[in-house]
UniProtKB/Swiss-Prot annotation:
It is an enzyme of class 3 (hydrolase). It comes from Pectobacterium atrosepticum (strain SCRI 1043 / ATCC BAA-672). The keyword Aminoacyl-tRNA synthetase does not apply. The keyword ATP-binding does not apply. This is Phosphoglycolate phosphatase.
């Protein structure tokens, strides 16, 4: 595997990259739909709606259920979703394989790291803490922390400014076209993980700089050694 040179910092998407969050999100969306006498969508379908933030996910759910997503209906459904998600976020979220171990090694080796997600900000830090990885990040940017979300480059510009990095020095790791497009627009290099959601599309179609199946392969990619062997993704 060829190394990416001159990388001094890493930023990570959250849902579909660091955590498998579809179960918790789907449970909350389905409860919000059923509470309005609408059909439940199910986890496999909801997983294809993840990536653009809660409002867009709610809009997609309403359209799928045959309901016009007016501003009032979206707000009502979003409020229901937020209430239900507060109950399902912890039990319905797990780390993907190799994530915690790899982040720990990167932190030990002094690599500054950020999370950049479109997820509503109030859920992000508690979720990271609950999964035992919150302390690895010097910067956390949620969907409510910027005026425009990914795929706009604004969140990555904020990372560059806060971490004092040039665009060429930041590597953004994500699982969806929004992540890759944001990195490309910001002038950063990108890694596309194959195991995420990405609206049911292959991440290769978005042309990231590197495509990886295993999270731990980030270490040799940026010239860092792994302290122990890790199991491959299955």
């Amino acid at each position: 595997m060829a190394e990416l040179t001159a990388i001094r910092g890493l930023a990570f998407d959250l849902d579909g990259t660091l955590i498998h969050s579809a179960p918790g999100l789907a449970a909350a969306i389905d409860q919000a739909l059923v509470a309005q006498s609408l059909p439940a969508a199910g986890e496999s379908r909801v997983a294809t709606w993840i990536g653009n933030g809660a409002d867009v996910m709610v809009e997609r759910a309403l359209r799928w259920a045959g309901v016009e997503p007016t501003a009032a209906r979206v707000q009502e459904t979003r409020e229901r979703f937020d209430s239900y998600y507060a109950q399902t976020v912890d039990s319905g979220s797990t780390l993907f394989l190799q994530v915690k171990e790899t982040l720990a090694q990167l932190a030990q080796q002094g690599v500054p790291m950020a999370v950049v997600t479109n997820k509503p900000t109030p859920f992000v830090a508690p979720l990271l803490a609950g999964l035992g990885i919150g302390d690895y990040f010097s910067l956390i940017i949620g969907g409510d922390d910027v005026i425009v979300k990914k795929p706009h480059p604004a969140p990555l510009y904020l990372v560059l400014g806060k971490l004092g990095l040039r665009a060429s020095e930041l590597l953004f790791v994500g699982d969806s076209r929004n992540d890759i497009q944001a990195a490309q627009a910001a002038g950063c290099r990108s890694v596309g993980m194959t195991y995420g959601y990405n609206y049911g599309e292959a991440i290769e179609l978005s042309q990231p700089d590197v495509v990886l199946d295993r999270f731990a392969d980030i270490l040799p990619l940026i010239g860092h050694s792994s302290s122990h062997n890790q199991e491959p993704l299955v």
